Amino acid sequence: MFPSLDTNGYDLFDPFIPHQTTMFPSFITHIQSPNSHHHYSSPSFPFSSDFLESFDESFLINQFLLQQQDVAANVVESPWKFCKKLELKKKNEKCVDGSTSQEVQWRRTVKKRDRHSKICTAQGPRDRRMRLSLQIARKFFDLQDMLGFDKASKTIEWLFSKSKTSIKQLKERVAASEGGGKDEHLQVDEKEKDETLKLRVSKRRTKTMESSFKTKESRERARKRARERTMAKMKMRLFETSETISDPHQETREIKITNGVQLLEKENKEQEWSNTNDVHMVEYQMDSVSIIEKFLGLTSDSSSSSIFGDSEECYTSLSSVRGMSTPREHNTTSIATVDEEKSPISSFSLYDYLCY
């Protein structure tokens, strides 16, 4: 960048750097020589004014800039940058030379690492992985898909849970083969216990089956009854709808019939009430007639008999008084005429009185 300066092998002195010890050789040799017995006081500034004036300003500026570049290059770098530089250098060497001898040695010295963890068993450490044959692998993965599991460990857990009894039997057999006669005796007892438990379980199952069968039968019967009821109701509804379709004025007819029946009942009630009123009026009139006869001094057996006698005689006397035609037989009319002949004055007077 800047032109180099020829100094004949001597370092130039920079006044801006205080710790620089480089000076001209004559001055240094004169101070450091052991033969010199004279002690000279170190001057505050070793160069004379004539020497400094001889240098140009451009020379000093160039020297100052060169020293700044050296200082910037000697700055301590971080280890991270230093490692990066080393890696770049190695890559460049590989690109140029290919595979170096150092790389080959490093490959030979590195050992193979087992990435998968192992399990300690009775026969030593074993790998967790296992290889399955093609047929068994297909069956296994088919079962896993049927169960809907994501991992193979879950399917194996399911298989273990379903084969607990067989695993127990295997353990017992292994223990019996290792133990001897005592274990065989224990096995027999355990077998007997298992058989008794099986019998109890079978009995319970039969009971539950019978009870469930009975409940099913009762439910079926109830359903049949309900069906029959619904069928009968449906038939009745169909019959009613058919009648209404065939005779649409049936409802009006029924209403008319009911109204007629009600009218007849009202008429019968009115007739009964009128009859009772007539009887009461007759009794009242008879009482009044007896009072009038007593007042006039006319006492006759016919009047007393007509008042306190039979109902037929009372009816005939009242009919004669009121002048009504009675639908009785001839004997009643004859009795009335006889009574009138016996007492013509009383009958005449009573009739006139009543008419009046």
From Swiss-Prot:
Pfam families: TCP (PF03634). Residues 173-198 have a biased composition (Basic and acidic residues). Residues 216-233 form the R domain. Residues 173-226 are annotated as: Disordered. The keyword DNA-binding applies. PROSITE patterns: R, TCP. GO terms for molecular function: DNA binding; DNA-binding transcription factor activity. The keyword Zinc does not apply. Induction: Repressed transiently after shoot apical meristem (SAM) decapitation (release from apical dominance). InterPro entries: CYC/TB1_R_domain (IPR017888), TF_TCP_subgr (IPR017887), Transcription_factor_TCP (IPR005333). Expressed in axillary buds, and, to a lower extent, in axillary structures such as flowers and siliques. One of its GO terms (biological process) is regulation of DNA-templated transcription. Keywords: Developmental protein, DNA-binding, Nucleus, Transcription, Transcription regulation. GO terms for cellular component: nucleus. Disulfide bonds: none annotated. Disruption phenotype: Increased shoot branching but reduced response to strigolactone (e.g. GR24). The triple mutant brc1 brc2 abcb19 is insensitive to GR24 treatment but is partially restored with regard to shoot branching. It is found in: Nucleus. Residues 112-170 form the TCP domain. Transcription factor that prevents axillary bud outgrowth. May also delay early axillary bud development. Probably involved in the auxin-induced control of apical dominance. This is Transcription factor TCP12. The lineage of its organism: Eukaryota, Viridiplantae, Streptophyta, Embryophyta, Tracheophyta.
